[in-house]
Each structure stands twice: as C-alpha cells, then as structure tokens.
C-alpha cells in the first residue's frame, strides 16, 4: 500500500495542490487555527516590516497536511515580497541553490520544503548564506580551484519539514524562528471546511461541515479532500447541497468512519483484538495476519492509531487499548 493512495492520507497528491491553491488563505487574518503560531508570527512580521528588514529565517515543522506551505506563502504576502519555492530533493548540487539565491530581491522569501532532505554539499553552501548573506563559490578544479564570495541581498529562508529531528544541528541552529504546527481541533476544521466550501461555490450547512471535520484526522488537507468527494456525491445523489445526512452517507460510501478510520485502520485494530486477544503481538505476526508489509504498518498505519490512543507499541509487541475495544463496541478480555 502507498500512503498517498488512501483517501485519508495526509500526504499531498497533484489534485490536492491544484485545489489547495484556489482555497488557500492568503493572509494571517484568513488563517484558521494554530493561534499561538499566528499570534507570534503577526508580531515578528510587523516588527520586521517596521524596521524595513528581512524576517528572521523560519523553520516550520509538524505532520504533513497541516499548512506549512500555506504559512510560508502567507509570510511572503504579509511582508509584501516575492517567494521562490523549491524542495530538498530537488537541490542536488550547490549550483542549484546558488542559482536561486542569486536571483532573490532584497527581503524575498526562499521556501525549501522537505528541508531535512538537503544533501550535505548543498547544506554547506546554505550556512554562510543564512548567517552572513554571502555565497561561497568554488571556481575551477584541483589545485587551481579557488573560492570567491558573492554578496547576497538580505532574504528570509523558510524551511518546512515533517522530521525536525532529522535536521543537522548546524542547520537547525541558524533558524531564528521555529514554529511547530499541531493537529487541528474539530471546531477549527469545521471553520476550514466551511470556508473551503464557500471558495468552491458550494452550499454547505454547519452540520455538513461538522460531519467532515470529525472524520478529517485533525488535518486540513484531508478535510479538503473529503469535501471534494462529498461534493461529487451531493451532485449525483442529491441537489448539490451538502448537509449532515448527505455528508454522513458519502463518508459511509467511502468507508471512512466517525474517527476518520478507513478499512485498513479497522483491519489492523481488529486483527490485534480478534486474532491475538488484544496483544501483545509482534510486527512479523501482525504483518502476516493482515497481509501488509512491515514498513507499511510502521510508517503508514500505526502512527495515527498510536497518537490517538487506539494502539500501543510495547517491548513485547503491539497491544490494543481500551479505546480500541470501545470503538468497536467490544469488551476487553479482562471484562468478560
């Protein structure tokens, strides 16, 4: 199984990018949720604007689908500057980064997604650029090689990552501002779904938005993806209006339950409960029981279940929690 193939995956796909551009908030005033982050960024941005300086370099980290790219674009809009966007894997050579840096205007934003995947060679070029706004370039090869320094205009580097722990200490320490994005609560997601529906010209009730928000796993990207699928359902099966019952019927058809679990989430939990008496069960046995690769279980299926308290990893293996039994209306073995 590929994570992006799941409807409730937080990993972005091409369709997400196209629609997200149409509904993405442009300014902090339009940004819903992440209140502590927004409050701090409003102050930092206003202070930089008043001084006529570039904003300090900013690192944004957190799970996928929470709005890191959106926030980077908002920062550029609020500062009234241009933004150039790239990603860690794309910057293969030092020259790739140098080409971007030398084309920046004063106070512009350079946004690097998946910054934890920068190669060491590229990262070395980034250090003096971030600290001193200077670019060290090697001219020639072998004994005749020499280094020249180019002055760069002041700029803001915004790095985004889902794995802040994978960043090297020298790189992490060069960011003046570090912000972590948290999963969204149902109220904020309801507001996000309602706003997205308005942007797409859809008629949606509060109950309809709430129904989607509850099943979105705390992630706006999933909420917006579910909205698009419910839009299709409402268009074909109803009059196009999305209310609570229509949203619930669409989610049932798509096999996404009230907790945002899909078929594979439920299959894993029920395997632990029914086949292994709630656990503990080793990863090899669990993989064989549900017919999935071990890497898929560890990287795709388990994280959300563990985070929400439905599954535990212990030294002896995986165990279903009381919350997992309650979700399926089952009694734990010690209660029978």
Curated annotation (Swiss-Prot):
GO terms for biological process: DNA recombination; DNA repair. Keywords: ATP-binding, Cytoplasm, DNA damage, DNA recombination, DNA repair, DNA-binding, Hydrolase, Nucleotide-binding. DNA binds at residues 313, 318. Has 3 domains, the large (RuvB-L) and small ATPase (RuvB-S) domains and the C-terminal head (RuvB-H) domain. The head domain binds DNA, while the ATPase domains jointly bind ATP, ADP or are empty depending on the state of the subunit in the translocation cycle. During a single DNA translocation step the structure of each domain remains the same, but their relative positions change. This is Holliday junction branch migration complex subunit RuvB. The keyword Nucleotide-binding applies. Belongs to the RuvB family. Mg(2+) binds at residue 69. It comes from Aeromonas salmonicida (strain A449). Its EC number is 3.6.4.-. It comes from the Bacteria. The RuvA-RuvB-RuvC complex processes Holliday junction (HJ) DNA during genetic recombination and DNA repair, while the RuvA-RuvB complex plays an important role in the rescue of blocked DNA replication forks via replication fork reversal (RFR). RuvA specifically binds to HJ cruciform DNA, conferring on it an open structure. The RuvB hexamer acts as an ATP-dependent pump, pulling dsDNA into and through the RuvAB complex. RuvB forms 2 homohexamers on either side of HJ DNA bound by 1 or 2 RuvA tetramers; 4 subunits per hexamer contact DNA at a time. GO terms for cellular component: cytoplasm; Holliday junction resolvase complex. It is an enzyme of class 3 (hydrolase). Coiled coil: none annotated. CDD domains: AAA (cd00009). It catalyses: ATP + H2O = ADP + phosphate + H(+). Residues 258-336 are annotated as: Head domain (RuvB-H). The keyword DNA repair applies. It is found in: Cytoplasm. Residues 4-184 are annotated as: Large ATPase domain (RuvB-L).
């Amino acid at each position: 199984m590929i994570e992006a193939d799941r409807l409730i995956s937080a990993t972005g796909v091409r369709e997400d990018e196209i629609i997200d551009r149409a509904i993405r908030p442009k300014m902090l005033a339009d940004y819903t949720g992440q209140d502590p982050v927004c409050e701090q960024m409003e102050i930092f941005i206003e202070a930089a604007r008043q001084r006529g300086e570039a904003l300090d370099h900013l690192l944004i980290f957190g799970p996928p689908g929470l709005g890191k790219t959106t926030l980077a674009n908002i920062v550029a809009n609020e500062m009234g500057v241009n933004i150039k966007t790239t990603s860690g894997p794309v910057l293969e050579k030092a020259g790739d980064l140098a080409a971007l840096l030398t084309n920046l205007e004063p106070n512009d934003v350079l946004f690097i997604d998946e910054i934890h995947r920068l190669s060491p060679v590229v990262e070395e070029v980034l250090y003096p650029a971030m600290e001193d706004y200077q670019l060290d370039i090697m001219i020639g090869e072998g004994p005749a090689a020499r280094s020249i320094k180019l002055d760069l205009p002041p700029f803001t580097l915004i790095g985004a990552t889902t794995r802040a722990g994978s960043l090297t200490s020298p790189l992490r320490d060069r960011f003046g501002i570090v912000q972590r994005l948290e999963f969204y609560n149902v109220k904020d997601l309801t507001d996000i779904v309602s706003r997205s529906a308005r942007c797409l010209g859809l008629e949606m009730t509060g109950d309809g938005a709430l129904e989607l928000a509850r099943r979105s796993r705390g992630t706006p990207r999933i909420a917006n993806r579910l909205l698009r699928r419910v839009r299709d359902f409402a268009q074909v099966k109803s009059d196009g209006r999305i209310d609570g019952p229509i949203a619930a019927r669409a989610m049932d058809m798509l096999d996404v339950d009230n907790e945002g679990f899909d078929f594979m989430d439920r299959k894993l939990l029920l395997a632990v409960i029914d086949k292994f008496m709630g656990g503990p069960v080793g990863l090899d046995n669990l993989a064989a029981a549900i017919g999935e690769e071990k890497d898929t279980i560890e990287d795709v299926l388990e994280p959300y279940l563990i985070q929400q308290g439905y599954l535990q990893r212990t030294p002896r293996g995986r165990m279903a929690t009381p919350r997992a039994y309650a979700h399926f209306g089952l009694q734990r073995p010690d209660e029978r």
